[in-house]
Amino acid sequence: LMGDLTGSMSAYHAILKRKFTEICTTLFQLIPNLRIGIIFYLDHGSGDPYITKVQPLTVNVEQLQSFILGTPDGFGGDEDEAVEDALHDALKMNWCEINTHSIVLFGDARPHEVSVCPYQHDYFKITESLFKKQVTINTVYCSTGSDYRRQSSLYEVEIGNFSRRVSRLGNPEFFSWIANVTGGIAIGVEQIDDIVDIIKGLAAKDAGKIDELEKEELKITLRPIPALVHIKKQAKLIEERKKLLGFG
């Protein structure tokens, strides 16, 4: 899990504080050999308490919950946020510990261009390196009222196509690009509470457990969850495309 904890995202952090144990319980029951890591990020030089905070991959739910509760929100500086620093941290994660390499990235702002990042982190090259490690990046664009079904179509690119560099994309377009180019799903948030179902759905999707999650959620809600239905539909299309391209 990777997420923006600047001021505009405080409501999402509050939901994670309340609901993360529920998310973990569901996913650990569904997915064998699951490990969860967390990377939170803020911005550079804005008086914030950190740029990124990392919880390495673990099966310890109490440790994960403690990390979420103990990591403070920040303010953020300019409009762009330190997404590139978080991606750089993700590159250093011990991915060999797990079979399915998957990130769920949530936020509402794009990264800095390499010329602006104090550490010269290049999100384009880092994303390509993550893709080569077979890491899928799913994104949740956190702007309430956005149509979750349209997010993937805002920047269409072939899976694995890094031949053309992107730069200075708009915020929603960045979240669309990074998901599409790594074979992930980009989804928007219509209501803040939706993020819980979306995180569970995206994680279950990459582990091949979306059907099982849907059945479990139906027992509770007694009705299909639109975000899960959308994720399942998109996942099928992406898997077909991956096979066509030789990634499946």
Please identify what each model-predicted range represents.
Residues 2-248:
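Divalent cation-coordinating acidic motifs and surrounding scaffolds
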